[in-house]
């Protein structure tokens, strides 16, 4: 069983997640820790609980979701796992950050690429990669069928959807992917989004 711990980081209020199992192994999803105190909060939480990070996963590579990639990679010797189509977005992130007045040092090491249908395994727990572009060119989500949740990134929010006015965004595609990828999940599936409070598939379909 995977348990979800949530952090809200940076002036952009991005949700960073740690998924841990009973044995203490864990996955870090979308580390958006920008300030030093935020990075300490993340690492202190991990060390105080005795967790062992095994994966660094990015739903997509907009600046607010990768602020902490370099820190997490260096601290825990992890390689970011992304969709290959997000690589240009990752490379552009520092330039985008300057426009936001939030310069940062980007991760520049090796990458592991994930594709639709791939499985990320942590012991007996499994996350399935869902391909849901539209907010960004190659956005992916991570679905845990056994525990009934999906790490949705910036695809679907409570009472809202991801913005599509950023480079690589496509509104019609996002709407289609929400219908074809997200809304086919069970209604009780919990959605952990990149911003704001969690929701469920059923709630969003009704609203």
Name these PLM-found stretches.
Residues 1-49, 141-152:
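Conserved beta-strand hairpin/beta-sheet module of binuclear metal-dependent hydrolase folds
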Residues 7, 19, 117-124:
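Short acidic-hydrophobic surface loop/beta-edge motif
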Residues 7-8, 109-112, 131-133:
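Short Gly/Pro-enriched turn/cap motifs at secondary-structure boundaries
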Residues 33-34, 51, 96, 125-207:
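Metallo-beta-lactamase
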């Amino acid at each position: 069983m995977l348990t979800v711990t949530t952090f809200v980081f940076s002036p952009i209020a991005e949700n960073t997640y740690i998924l841990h199992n009973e044995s203490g192994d864990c996955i870090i999803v979308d580390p958006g820790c920008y300030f030093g105190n935020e990075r300490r909060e993340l690492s202190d939480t991990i060390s105080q609980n005795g967790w062992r990070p095994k994966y660094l996963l990015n739903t997509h590579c907009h600046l607010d979701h990768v602020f902490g990639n370099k820190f997490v990679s260096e601290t825990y010797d992890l390689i970011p796992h992304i969709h290959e189509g997000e690589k240009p977005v990752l490379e552009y992130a520092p330039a985008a950050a300057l426009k936001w007045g939030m310069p940062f040092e980007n991760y520049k090491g090796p990458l592991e690429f994930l594709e639709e249908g791939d499985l990320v395994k942590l012991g007996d727990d499994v996350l399935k990669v869902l391909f849901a572009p539209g907010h960004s060119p190659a956005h992916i989500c991570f679905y845990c069928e056994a525990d009934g949740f999906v790490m949705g990134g910036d695809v679907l929010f409570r009472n809202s959807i991801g913005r599509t006015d950023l480079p690589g965004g496509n509104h019609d595609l996002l709407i289609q992917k929400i219908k074809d990828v997200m809304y086919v999940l069970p209604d009780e599936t919990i959605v952990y989004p990149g911003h704001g409070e969690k929701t469920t598939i059923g709630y969003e379909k009704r609203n």
